[in-house]
Design a protein with these regions (language model features):
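Short tryptophan-centered beta-strand motifs in secreted/extracellular beta-sheet-rich domains
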Residues: 84, 132-134, 198-213
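Extracellular beta-strand elements of beta-rich domains used
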Residues: 84, 250-254
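Ser/Thr-rich, Proline-interspersed low-complexity disordered segments
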Residues: 20-77
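Short strand-turn-strand beta-turns centered on an Asx-Gly dipeptide
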Residues: 214-218
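Extracellular glycan-recognition surfaces and repeat-rich motifs
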Residues: 87-116
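Short, aromatic/His-centered strand-loop micro-motif at the edge of beta-sheets
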Residues: 178-201
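Secretory/extracellular carbohydrate-interaction modules
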Residues: 112-176
């Protein structure tokens, strides 16, 4: 009897000991799965004009600047005039660097991007020897912002460029196979009205390798370069800094020369 009582007593003590043990809280661990990271595929930016930040002067043997050259040229029949009413004649649209549009008898190039560059080439205007003049009217322009006339253009990497700055300078550039050079580097001229608003009449005579350049009926310079013999004509605008640049072109006249 006493032995049975002892066994029952020890059993109850064991149960009480187990009841006093701390509870173990087993939490379920979340399963972490790696989410793949999306890879951004870069969108290529269309290059509308070859970079020409660094200009290399032509070798002395191929460079000829003759400001005193005879500028009396006989013009025969007019090849065409453009009063900028037909949008089919020019490259127009909204581009990465700004807007090109026709309106009010003007072709307007508005650069909206820092150091942006816009240009427009006239369709089906392949010229070799000619006299051309066009009016340029900058409305937003400052400092070394540039605008001007392109000719003998056969590709984005082959043409001549008559460039005017908004602080009264000009230069003549040549791009050949994508490489830029300056037969006539930046030169100050009192014939170029600085700033905006202003207006200038830009003119070019091209006869073979001989080329002459004018602003407002004043002869600026002449160069001799046989590299590019023919091509289309066009206009351009370049922003030198972060500010917008807007230039409108009008009254384009192109003549044959004797």
């Amino acid at each position: 009897m006493n032995r049975t009582f002892l066994v029952i007593f020890l059993f109850h003590i064991s149960l009480a000991s187990v009841a006093c043990l701390p509870l173990i809280n087993v939490e379920s661990q979340p399963i972490v799965s790696e989410i793949p990271t999306a890879t951004n595929t870069p969108i290529p930016t269309k290059v509308w004009f070859p970079p020409t930040a660094t200009y290399t002067p032509l070798p002395a043997s191929s460079r000829l600047i003759t400001p005193t050259i005879e500028t009396n040229t006989n013009y025969s029949s007019k090849i065409f005039s453009d009063n900028f009413t037909d949008p089919k004649n020019w490259e127009l649209g909204t581009f990465a660097d700004g807007i090109i549009a026709i309106g009010n008898n003007e072709l307007t190039l508005a650069v909206k991007k820092e150091r942006g560059y816009l240009f427009s080439i006239r369709e089906q205007t392949n010229l070799s020897d000619f006299y051309a003049e066009i009016s340029a009217r900058p409305s937003i322009c400052r400092g070394e912002d540039e605008y001007g006339f392109l000719f003998r253009y056969s590709s984005p990497g082959d043409f001549y460029r008559f460039s005017i700055t908004c602080n009264g300078q000009y230069r003549i550039d040549r791009l050949f196979e994508g490489q830029a050079s300056s037969p006539q580097p930046f030169t100050i001229s009192g014939s170029i009205p600085p700033g905006a608003p202003s207006e200038s009449r830009i003119a070019v005579i091209a006869r073979g390798k001989e080329m002459q350049f004018f602003i407002n009926d004043e002869h600026l310079t002449s160069i001799s370069d046989p590299t590019l013999g023919n091509g289309n004509i066009g206009v351009f605008v370049r922003a030198a800094g972060e500010d917008d640049v807007t230039v409108s072109y009008s009254n384009l006249d192109v003549y044959e020369i004797d």
